[in-house]
Amino acid sequence: MTSLRFVLTPACLAVGLCIASLGAQAQTTKAPKVQLWMDVSTGTMAGMPEMDSLPGGGGMLGGLMGGVGGGAQGRAGGGNTSYGHARAMSIMPPRVIDIALHNTLRPGVEASQAIPPGMRMGESLPLIPPRAQPTQTEPGEVPQEYQQHQPKGRILLYWGCGASVRAGQPRVIDLARAKPTDYAQAFAGRAVPDRGPRVGPAYALYPNERNQVSLSRDSSLVGEHQVRGDGVPASMKFTLGAAQDLMPAIDLRTTGKPQDSMGTSWQPVRNARAYYLHAMSQSGDDLIMWSSAETPDTGMGLFDYLSPATIDRWLKERVLLQPETTQCAIPQGIFAGGGRDATPMLRMMAYGGESHIVHPPRPADPKAAWEPEWAVRVRVKSHTMAMLGEEMQGRRGGMGAAPPAASGGAYSSGMGGAPTGQQPAGDGGAESGNAGNVVNPVNLLRGILGR
């Protein structure tokens, strides 16, 4: 078997940047002839059973927390029917894989990826060139259609784990007095440049029109993979290990009412390098945001894959929580003003690793030319969402529902199911009970921005 070498590059944003940086060492380098990108994501809704889709495309949950962009970035549910769901906060299906192949030898030609039996998706996945699509909005970016209208209301930013609001908070952004560039920047906040492929007709993608098979609960990417196709080097075989495998679902539990200091706790997530929590709600025309970071930020740009270098830097700056962290308190009363019509929504990220595989490996001799035949990048993450406060306690019917909460409210991810001998509470589905009162950030942004 051809000898392969894992090249883990925490300081590089992508294989292309890594190769370019080697130029400073006077080594002649060329970009890989064939590049493969694999994004893997696990997503759940705390207290809800896992579902691949809901009737009618997911209804309210189909657009919940999907971001303000279009395309796959703007959909949080409804099935893994097209490329791009891994970067979004997809919860239906709960496990998503996006694959993009760029073959400079034969651009836009169909290919296939042989996969290990443990993926439980068949022997191989077809990689198909996409149809032309409008340019998608980047995470945190306010669409142009919303920027044409003068916004109203304010953004109130709170930050940090703790039972009480800290001195100097909240930071207030008055949208009615801000320039369009100011409020666009306010929504974007801290973010990283898009490091994904700019897919188009020259690429071949999965999922696609021919195949939308999703990863199952017991799927595993561990094992040998091989890309085949016209112009693809016969040597394009690589082995993925535990570090590149699907991350577990986040087992999140929340307690307390909006007028209280609400608690969040979770079990450690395997292969998680850092965590980040973000909650938001509405009070009149005001948008209230809180994050677990030690610095103020809207947090709209952090719900994406992060490079190892970015994770390390933001851990040092205390933007992200350390991987050994298992709990975080939300300050008392910051979401109390919304009342029954605005149940706060919490999002949580567990950032996994990023691996680069390049063949052949870089020569030890710095004077020798390096001409990689192919390169692979694999990124993994896990995320979950929860409705905060007692209004939604015990209202999740079906498998994995949380038991009735004691006074003060408690909310579990339901990953372990109801306790032995206790029936799951609630008789409603995903769109029953008070689900209609949950804050939908897409609609909330439309209201603030005058749409």
Where do the model's predicted regions map?
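Conserved aromatic anchor
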Residues: 262-271
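Solvent-exposed N-terminal domain segments of exported/luminal and surface proteins
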Residues: 28-209
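Short, aromatic- and glycine-rich surface loops/edge beta-strands on solvent-exposed regions
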Residues: 201, 211-236, 340-355
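Hydrophilic extracytoplasmic domains
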Residues: 270-274, 283-451
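N-terminal secretory signal peptides that target proteins for export/translocation
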Residues: 1-7
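Bacterial N-terminal signal peptides
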Residues: 9-21
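Proline/serine/threonine-rich low-complexity linkers at boundaries of modular beta-sandwich domains
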Residues: 233-246
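Sec/Tat signal peptide C-region and signal peptidase I cleavage site
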Residues: 22-26
